[in-house]
Amino acid sequence: MVYITPKGKINLPNYKGGTTIDKSIMYQYITAIGLFCNFLGLFSVFYFIGFNESIGGNKPTLEDDSSVRWVYLFAGMMIFIYMMMDNIDGKQARRTKTSSPLGELFDHGCDSLCTGLLPLIVGISMGIRSWEILIAFMAATIPFYLAHWEEYFTHHLVLGALNGPTEAECMAILFCFLTGIFGQWIWFIKIDFSVLTFNHIQYTGQLNEMIFFAMAIISFVTAFQNILTSTKKAIDMKISLFTAYSQPIPFIIFFCSEFIWLKLSPSLFLTYPIIHILSLTFIFSYVVCRCIVQRICQEDFRLFYKPLIFLIGCVLNTAAKVYLNIEILDEQISVLLLFAISLGFMFHFTYSIIQEMCLVLKINAFTIPSSSPPIKKLN
């Protein structure tokens, strides 16, 4: 399978690199400069997956979670490392004169994986229910995809004052550390909103639910801003809105398929929540990475990708069982197969796109050319 078209291979060497307009408070005033780059970021991604499995196996209780508190602390530390590496890897690449379209793709690819995994980690740490974790997953992935869709038109990845790569990750670090120190009980504190609204609204909610609700609102507001900016830019570029709005079709198919699947068989998600979200994360990352490749190579957007076939197949399998009472394949097996297939697609894409880009750009992956100037050591 070839991921770059002949047209893309011609355009790829001429790619000048997109720019990131990061208004983040953390990025401008707090984040330090270091020597590390994508390797530790990739390590953090694999740790995130391991964290989810370790927590899922321990199954701590609200009354006694002392046996796994160290995992929450370790999670916070690894999110911090990932955040630092993600913020400085571009600086390190420019410093060593190894900036390339492949490095940009690798950076955003790691981000796409962590965008799906981070809500799962924080949700487990804060004791959020499975359905709320899924809502948080959707709330995180929608603005992320739309931000890269917007970049296709503007050639700028715009990150607002409160954004995922920094502020949201800092909040995740804080939440994990608080859980590790005090335990999950702190997130189940009841808040009486009738006091804040002069008794006009009678509502009492848990702290963790209120936090996730606020984060979801911020995500959807950000997504709306992405759509508005992309629409204005498409009009300025004289691109028909039909063409512009058809480009997110793969993500819309992904989103709608998942919603229908959960509507048909909610118990299936509750039985395998971690495997389910990991499968969705791999498919989401695949779709986003293909979008980035098309932007870098100045190719036309594709409206469908092969991993979506298997997601749709799982939905149809469940629909046949619910409406026709025909069990083509056991639902639990279908979830596990989707996980294996989506992971396989992600591995194949990663290996193949590295080979293709290295061949076109005449570079070696994860190496600093000998012709590059030596790096000065920090005192």
Curated annotation (Swiss-Prot):
GO molecular function annotations of the record: phosphotransferase activity, for other substituted phosphate groups
Gene Ontology terms: biological process: phospholipid biosynthetic process
Bilayer-crossing regions: 30-50, 70-90, 117-137, 142-162, 171-191, 210-230, 241-261, 268-288, 308-328, 333-353
Pfam family, one: CDP-OH_P_transf
Nucleotide-binding in keyword set: no
Subcellular location: Membrane
Gene3D superfamilies: 1.20.120.1760
Protein name listed in UniProt: Uncharacterized CDP-alcohol phosphatidyltransferase class-I family protein 4
